[in-house]
Amino acid sequence: MENKSHAFLLEWTVNFIKNKDIISRKIEKIKNGKDGFDLYVKYKDREQYFIIAPNIIDIDSIIKRINNNAYFSLVTLNSKENFDAVLKSWSKMISFKFLNIIFVNPFSGLDKKWIVFPYTHHKISDESS
């Protein structure tokens, strides 16, 4: 089941980033598996690495792969367990300036996804939120 979820989210992510790029046309290359990441996208102005984790089991191993030298996205299913895993490690995630987390609701009739940038969210919001 995990492999099907991973394959689904990988395909969803490729479609999502291609659709976002329809107007700007900045994508130069999309590659699977570069440097141990699920997806790599070379834009004209940056590189972005994607980690696809349908169910976040070990968030610390994900955090160890991230740095401030490139753009990173964590793509996961929108579930209470995944949300709680992110909250548990929030204090670590806010230190990565170019990290975003995409929570995907593939079968929702309305909101298909929501995205949070921990670094930015921490800078502009109240600690209690």
What is each model feature region?
Residues 47-68, 81-87:
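Active-site-adjacent loop/helix micro-motif of nuclease/hydrolase catalytic cores
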Residues 44, 55, 77-81, 94, ...:
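Short, flexible beta-strand-to-coil junctions
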Residues 66-71, 86-129:
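Non-catalytic C-terminal interaction segments of nucleic acid-processing enzymes
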Residues 1-45:
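Acidic-basic catalytic patches of nuclease active cores, encompassing PD-(D/E)XK
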